[in-house]
């Protein structure tokens, strides 16, 4: 494969020197871009877009044509793994993901297969290979998965949830069943991410979107334990280069020390965590990614620039920072504002890397 022309992102994750702070955006390929909407319309629906390697490749590359981003992330969905387990994923207009066959009983968990990344999830691997080929070494490609806990919330609830009633009922009434499910998911995610790495992903990220819904003790037992298992099982070197691993628990700022002890290379931060405090606590062990509130992108260019400057100043000089939003970019943000954000990070961060 082509030699990497811009390795700022990978270097920052490994706390190595860079010339400017690298930047990318969660959900950077998405509905805020008119070209994405056109490609999705061509695909017909969201999962058809994910399953078409050529179209998934196209939307992955779209933000790079607009902005000088330092990384690109595979266009896919965290629910591809449970879908490949046979739960029947579909999307209800205005309501989000739904599963036709949610997990209700222990026997449902026992019957779950562990998907083969090159068979049931082969369309994802094909997309990774196509993207790497089209990138021609421009920037690194990030692969990703949902964390076992986060995937389990959708599988047990049958879709999105705000109260997490069903999975918390399982957690407190049938913890052995939940552990069995999480263990199967961890094994599946290891295979899935290693498949992405073999196909060409140069870094991987675990999205623990709903870990923050747990108590501290439950987080360690039902979420972090399984992310640790995944980190232990991942390929950490491919094609002679280290493959960095980033963990992101939304609402998990109180658990950074425990997360850093998993052996990951970096932690993602949401905007509720002070990045200066995070660096003091774990900056000698891991890089940090984040953490601007995505809603700042509704502001003027001057307001966006001010927030970027504040976060850069809070992190301070030196290595180990990847600038990002604290969660995904909102679908109604003007693309020009995202462009101002990326440019501001590169321009304002130069003085921190002398």
UniProtKB/Swiss-Prot annotation:
Its main location: cytoplasm. It is an enzyme of class 4 (lyase). GO terms for cellular component: cytosol. GO terms for biological process: protoporphyrinogen IX biosynthetic process from glutamate. Substrate binds at residues 27-31, 77, 154, 209, 327. One of its GO terms (molecular function) is uroporphyrinogen decarboxylase activity. It catalyses: uroporphyrinogen III + 4 H(+) = coproporphyrinogen III + 4 CO2. Pfam families: URO-D. It is found in: Cytoplasm. Pathway: Porphyrin-containing compound metabolism; protoporphyrin-IX biosynthesis; coproporphyrinogen-III from 5-aminolevulinate: step 4/4. InterPro entries: UROD/MetE-like_sf (IPR038071), Uroporphyrinogen_deCO2ase_HemE (IPR006361), Uroporphyrinogen_deCOase (IPR000257). Keywords: Cytoplasm, Decarboxylase, Lyase, Porphyrin biosynthesis. The record marks 77 as: Transition state stabilizer. The keyword Nucleotide-binding does not apply. Gene3D superfamilies: 3.20.20.210. Its EC number is 4.1.1.37. Homodimer. Belongs to the uroporphyrinogen decarboxylase family. Catalyzes the decarboxylation of four acetate groups of uroporphyrinogen-III to yield coproporphyrinogen-III. This is Uroporphyrinogen decarboxylase. It comes from Sodalis glossinidius (strain morsitans).
